[in-house]
């Protein structure tokens, strides 16, 4: 195509040369203004038609080539865009499926976790209940083990008492200690009434001979004042069984005995009692207190 344009331009040049030579031969008076006046500013001479045609054809070819190239680029970009859209759609579906699957798994784990927590809570509650029950059973067992020797001794003593018709061991509901039997009342009497009650049981009001006996009585008498077999009605303190007062064990509270005279009934304090703290006190004999009877354990062979 370019060669054709060159041929056309060559033919056009030859034709121009021929015309110029013809003009010279005929002595034409037509002069080229550009030759006569080098400063001529008129319109440029128009290019011949074949040259203009060749330039337009080149531009058309360039435009066509550019359009083809642009079309190819558009096709390539469109193809890649479609491929990217397809890949994005596939990726989106994959991510959506993954998200749904993950959410389902999390939901299953949450449900399983809730069930597990409920089961663990139930087990912990049952375990705590069993633990409390075991503690209670353990405390009960310790209590029975602690009192088992005493209970066994009491049962053995009661059995021996019945077998020997009351000639051996302590009577029923009496407690043995140090070779003596003790009975602790559950109601109250005056000192004289309590002393008479003990005599009817072939016993006497409590006579304390040692610190050990004092501790034993305090341990079993609860938190009540109790009468003991000690009185000074005749002006001096004496034990009801004849035990010597001066040489025997004593546990008076501070400032006691004081023979206080302020009772409404009149008279002083001539009868001894054990206070709630274990110390002794002289009190008005008509006061109503609990009491303890004591007698020697009978042993016959």
From Swiss-Prot:
Glycans are attached at residues 97, 165, 298. Residues 1-58 are cytoplasmic. Residues 16-39 have a biased composition (Basic and acidic residues). The modification Phosphoserine is found at residue 13. One of its GO terms (cellular component) is membrane. Expressed exclusively in hepatic parenchymal cells. GO terms for molecular function: carbohydrate binding. Residues 1-43 are annotated as: Disordered. Residues 169-295 form the C-type lectin domain. The chain crosses the membrane at residues 59-79. It is a single-pass type II membrane protein. Keywords: Calcium, Disulfide bond, Endocytosis, Glycoprotein, Lectin, Lipoprotein, Membrane, Palmitate, Phosphoprotein, Receptor, Signal-anchor, Transmembrane, Transmembrane helix. Residues 80-301 are extracellular. Disulfide bonds join 170-181, 198-293, 271-285. InterPro entries: C-type_lectin-like, C-type_lectin-like/link_sf, C-type_lectin/snaclec_domain, C-type_lectin_CS, CD209-like_CTLD, CTDL_fold. The keyword Hydrolase does not apply. One of its GO terms (biological process) is glycoprotein metabolic process. It is found in: Membrane. PROSITE patterns: C_TYPE_LECTIN_1 (PS00615), C_TYPE_LECTIN_2 (PS50041). It holds the Pfam family Lectin_N. Interacts with LASS2. Calcium is required for ligand binding. Mediates the endocytosis of plasma glycoproteins to which the terminal sialic acid residue on their complex carbohydrate moieties has been removed. The receptor recognizes terminal galactose and N-acetylgalactosamine units. After ligand binding to the receptor, the resulting complex is internalized and transported to a sorting organelle, where receptor and ligand are disassociated. The receptor then returns to the cell membrane surface. This is Asialoglycoprotein receptor 2. It comes from Mus musculus. The gene is Asgr2.
